[in-house]
Amino acid sequence: MPFNGEKQCVGEDQPSDSDSSRFSESMASLSDYECSRQSFASDSSSKSSSPASTSPPRVVTFDEVMATARNLSNLTLAHEIAVNENFQLKQEALPEKSLAGRVKHIVHQAFWDVLDSELNADPPEFEHAIKLFEEIREILLSFLTPGGNRLRNQICEVLDTDLIRQQAEHSAVDIQGLANYVISTMGKLCAPVRDNDIRELKATGNIVEVLRQIFHVLDLMQMDMANFTIMSLRPHLQRQLVEYERTKFQEILEETPSALDQTTEWIKESVNEELFSLSESALTPGAENTSKPSLSPTLVLNNSYLKLLQWDYQKKELPETLMTDGARLQELTEKLNQLKIIACLSLITNNMVGAITGGLPELASRLTRISAVLLEGMNKETFNLKEVLNSIGIQTCVEVNKTLMERGLPTLNAEIQANLIGQFSSIEEEDNPIWSLIDKRIKLYMRRLLCLPSPQKCMPPMPGGLAVIQQELEALGSQYANIVNLNKQVYGPFYANILRKLLFNEEAMGKVDASPPTN
């Protein structure tokens, strides 16, 4: 439609991950190291999904690159529709003061000014208006279902551009009447949310403004139709998602053999860390060293997933198999970092003034809310964490003293307050013992969560010191486990091939690096 092609973008309010079912059969080979070693050592997988190849690099054509891009785009869109219940298309308006916004406004206004001058000329010129009605007719017809023949015939009859041109040649065309018919038809086809827009159209007197607003409302109706289609498609897509994603990724892999390089490095990093941990355990005095240490594929893969909760999403590229969930994982990681700090602050407060404030749950709840509010946006580059932690410390002292005074008890002395604020501010320092303790306990909880069958019928026990964030951590953990379990179902065969290569072929030839991990 003329000058009204608003840019479409993806609306993603809050991610809502679908519950994933149990591992697919192809993932069963990862369930335990004790399963048949021979099956892992075999070379039954397709060569295109192997993490390494000895053949020379193949020249990739432009068409192959474009085919891969289309497959990746389709895979990403299908995944987003299936797992994000809030996914919808929205119109993104350009900022009014931006150059693009000003240019768009000027060009649009110029078009409608020309149309206004043509319709008010003597004699009037109708050619541009007729073209607009022709486009309106096609849009209205696109809303009809295959069975809507009666309305289809009526629209084609009333908005017959050949007939309208003949009427225009004899100055007998009724532009206002045609516009009224269009508005009436739009009222029959639109969603209830557009009823108010239709009423406003009927109340508009200027014919040029009516046509302008008709196109605006038609744009909204097209967006409504697209979102309705997405909503209708979602249940079917959810049922077919695992097979669809796996097939699409296999197509990408066939076009781009290097499409698993980052994934291989991600898993290899976990293998090296586990081997180093086992080698250190073997050197511990009194440890039995009767046989060569073995790694469980499930343990390696779960540890790889745990690394995603400490991923530097700004500097480090995600594994290819997790690209579709990158935004969700980043959001969970950022939220988890906030929960870690809240747990640290609560633990410090309990250690220092718990004896004084014990039995005051309303105070603990208020302090937690204050911390959560002040820590909002802590993952932004402009956020000064040390300054905010200092502010939380000061506010904590104020709230504690206020509560003590209300109960006629002595307030905290200056030394305790300074110590409390200092410990709060030191949380961000490297190797802080409180942070390390909370981080270790959260990792333990998440590791236990990944070991549960999917879907989770009950949550694992909450480690000590995390009660203050239990509700939020359980919700976050459930979302995280859903992402991981669905990812395992989809990409299980690819992970099996990589682990088969890393844990058996390379281990047998002594190729796995057991040096200390660098990060």
Swiss-Prot record:
BP-aspect Gene Ontology terms:
muscle cell migration; signal transduction
Which stretches does UniProt call biased (Low complexity)?
17-29
The record's InterPro entries line, in alphabetical order, gives: Tcp11
Name where it's found: Cytoplasm, Cytoskeleton
Q: What are the start and end residues of every segment in region (Disordered)?
A: 1-30
Pfam families the record matches: Tcp11
Sorted keywords for this record are: Cytoplasm, Cytoskeleton, Phosphoprotein
Origin superkingdom: Eukaryota
Q: Which sequence ranges form a coiled-coil region, renumbered to this chain?
A: none
Sites of the modification Phosphoserine?
Answer: S16
Cellular component (GO) terms are: cytoplasm; cytoskeleton
Question: Which family is this protein grouped under?
Answer: Belongs to the TCP11 family.
Per UniProt, subunit arrangement is: Interacts with FMNL2; this interaction promotes muscle-derived satellite cell (MDSC) migration and differentiation.
**Functional description taken from the UniProt entry:** Promotes the migration of muscle-derived satellite cells (MDSCs) during differentiation throught interaction with FMNL2 and therefore may participate in microfilament assembly.
Protein name as annotated: T-complex protein 11-like protein 2
Which organism encodes this protein? Homo sapiens (Human)
Give the gene name: TCP11L2
